[in-house]
Amino acid sequence: MNRISTTTITTITITTGNGAG
């Protein structure tokens, strides 16, 4: 569960950074 959460957060961060950039 913790691993999935980390992956999700990472994906969201990348997506947000990509969209913001």
Swiss-Prot record:
InterPro entries: Thr_lead_pept. GO terms for biological process: threonine biosynthetic process; transcriptional attenuation by ribosome. Keywords: Amino-acid biosynthesis, Leader peptide, Threonine biosynthesis. It comes from the Bacteria. The keyword Amino-acid biosynthesis applies. The keyword Signal does not apply. Pfam families: Leader_Thr. NCBIfam families: PRK09816.1, thr_lead_pep. Belongs to the thr operon leader peptide family. This protein is involved in control of the biosynthesis of threonine. This is thr operon leader peptide. It comes from Salmonella typhimurium (strain LT2 / SGSC1412 / ATCC 700720). The lineage of its organism: Bacteria, Pseudomonadati, Pseudomonadota, Gammaproteobacteria, Enterobacterales. The gene is thrL.
